[in-house]
Amino acid sequence: MISLIQAPHDTPLRIIDFKGGHGIRRRLLALGLHRNHIIELDSRSIFRGPVLIKDVTSDTSIALGRGIAQKIMVEIVGERK
């Protein structure tokens, strides 16, 4: 289990847990992100800035702040494309 920030690009990831309180969980659920959801890390800046993830099931992209992305714990479920 690793943080979304540490995950490799273009690799299917399963959301395992959200580190944080009820507010962060509610916000991520409102964005359509929940446990066991499959996503891919699409883009991440080297030092700071937003993280872009792709929802594999709906083929949509979501931009998250780096602080929120650090609170999303994922596991790798497949090989790179």
Task: Please name every model-derived segment.
Residues 23-27:
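Short alpha-helix capping/helix-loop boundary micro-motifs
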Residues 15-18:
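PDZ/PDZ-like domain segments forming the peptide/carboxylate-binding groove
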Residues 52-81:
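C-terminal structural segments of small proteins and small subunits
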